Curated annotation (Swiss-Prot):
The active site is at H39 (proton donor). This is Bifunctional pantoate ligase/cytidylate kinase. (R)-pantoate binds at Q63, Q158. The keyword Transferase applies. ATP binds at residues 32-39, 152-155, 181, 189-192.
Length: 513
């Protein structure tokens, strides 16, 4: 976004952050340095999703035990700096221990995560480790004040603990978990991999291989924890050079040990290869993958997604109807549409209920037990919905409800930030497009059929173009195509053709057993 700065003081960091507009979105990637492809993936995602990217490098002594590798932990500051510049990082924060812990560590205020999150997995053999992790991460989050912070799924226990601490302390940041990045041979990338000799590296592959064995059993319908763990242990017995620390199956959010996978489980493993301790994990998910359909107004998202959901046996979630409903509520109650606190406070008390019994008809919507299915599609609501949807507090409330609905999987959701913000982990992301002229023509014909002739085609085209601009420029969760979305242009295509294409893509990616 601007000049690259490598900063070593909190004063310098906060001064640099203060130069950005309040509307700027800040993405933060905390690291301990010795950056590799996994870190690069986090930075690239932050760069894609945020206006400003901040990376920190700090080898935190608070999270190392007395016999651990604090002194020999890899340090490569100049190479790390060059990589950050190459990836478009704006601010690289490289503080000293004295800068972050000026009073020393013996009398430091620390963050103690809930015991149930630390008594299993790595916490069992590394007492105090996650106290150190939580303390430094929350300290950095307070200093940087990011909108989004990015962490790798490889450190799954750390990710769960940070999410819990952020939620419990009401921190204003979204924690983003990103997939594990692996070398071509399957070994999960880690700064500690450079400790391994060629022979040790070959042995270390047993970790990811044992997870692959368990995943194969899971895909065949094995959901029992004891059987899955037996698959892992049986494979590892072939490698006596690898000393197993643990292999456990837990819930990925609560970290509670599971006896059987009912929805989703985290199969986590740690082991010693020589003097190097390595970790790895995989998610075993029984939930049906989410279909996320994004696109501009008038691209046909609602109709297409409803019909695709019916064909695939998924629940249809019309997020646009949710925003329309709360917009209607604001108008009905004569709220000042420029008074964001009043709007958010009012919407926080609203109860929304959606039903889509007929895929050929718009979603039926109730707000506070009052059906508003027709009212939310009025021209007045259409003209105001982007203004309300752009409010950060409103989007947060709606996204919370949308994620709660999608927590058990098996939904088809459409909107403008489904694949990028609401369900970034969606199994299939579709970006549905059409030219502004095509979308205006469709909307004009729809209004004609409904008996509304108040606007001309030219006026509708101007409205659609203005809404596109507003959605793309809103500061919170702006409208854009997800990097892994498949684009489908609906110009000159019939509804059935578009639905058929999406259904084929979903079934090809997720064949039913």
């Amino acid at each position: 976004m601007g000049t690259f700065h490598r900063l070593t003081t909190t004063a310098g960091l906060q001064t640099a952050l203060g130069t950005f507009s309040p509307a700027t979105t800040v993405g933060f990637v905390p690291t301990m340095g010795a950056l590799h492809g996994g870190h690069a993936a986090l930075i690239r995602r932050a760069r894609q999703e945020c206006d400003v990217v901040v990376v920190s490098i700090f080898v935190n002594p608070l999270q190392f035990g007395p016999q651990e590798d604090l002194e020999r932990y890899p340090r490569a500051l100049e190479a790390d700096t060059a990589l950050c510049q190459q990836l478009g990082v704006d601010l690289l924060f490289v503080p000293s221990v004295a800068e972050l812990y000026p009073t020393g560590m013996k009398h430091l205020t620390v963050v103690e995560p809930p015991r149930e999150l630390t008594e299993h997995l790595c916490g069992r053999s590394r007492p105090g480790h996650f106290r150190g992790v939580a303390t430094i991460v929350l300290k950095l989050l307070h200093l940087v004040q990011p909108d989004r912070a990015y962490f790798g799924q490889k450190d799954a226990q750390q990710l769960a603990i940070i999410r819990r601490c952020v939620a419990d302390l009401n921190l204003d940041v979204e924690i983003i978990g990103c997939p594990i990045v692996r070398d071509a041979d399957g070994l999960a990338l880690s700064s500690r991999n450079q400790y391994l000799s060629a022979e040790e590296r070959a042995t270390a592959l047993a970790l990811s291989q044992s997870l692959e064995v368990a995943q194969a059993a899971f895909r065949q319908g094995c959901w029992d924890a004891s059987l899955l763990l037996a698959q892992v242990q049986d494979h590892l017995r072939q490698f006596p050079q690898l000393r197993l620390d643990y292999a456990e199956l837990v819930h990925p959010q609560t970290l509670v040990p599971l006896e059987r996978i009912e929805t989703v489980g985290l199969l986590a493993i740690a082991g010693w290869v020589g003097q190097t301790r390595l970790i790895d994990n995989c998610l075993l998910d029984r939930r049906r993958p989410i279909l996320a359909v994004d696109g501009p107004a008038g691209a046909g998202k609602s109709t297409v997604t409803r019909l695709a959901a019916q064909a695939l046996g998924l629940r249809y979630l019309d997020t646009g109807a949710m925003y329309r409903a709360v917009t209607w509520w604001c108008l009905e109650n004569n709220l000042d549409l420029h008074d964001e606190p009043a709007i958010v406070e009012a919407i926080a008390h609203c109860r929304l209920h959606l039903e889509s019994p007929d895929p050929h008809q718009p979603t039926r919507v109730w707000i506070n037990d009052r059906e508003v299915s027709q009212a939310i599609r009025s021209l007045e609501v259409t003209q105001r919905v982007s203004q309300i949807a752009a409010l950060r507090g409103v989007r947060r409330l709606m996204v919370q409800q949308q994620r709660a609905i999608g927590a058990h999987g098996g939904i088809a959701a459409e909107g403008r930030d489904i694949g990028t913000h609401v369900f970034p982990e969606a199994g299939l992301k579709i970006f549905l497009t059409a030219s502004p002229e095509e979308r205006a023509q469709r909307r004009w014909q729809e209004l004609q059929q409904q008996g509304h002739c108040d606007l001309s085609y030219e006026e509708l085209l101007a409205q659609i173009t203005a809404r596109d601009t507003a959605d793309q420029q809103r500061p919170y969760a702006p409208f854009r195509k997800a990097a892994d979305a498949i684009e489908v242009c609906t110009d000159n295509l019939g509804i059935d053709e578009v639905v058929s294409k999406i259904v084929h893509l979903y079934r090809s990616r997720f064949p039913q057993p």
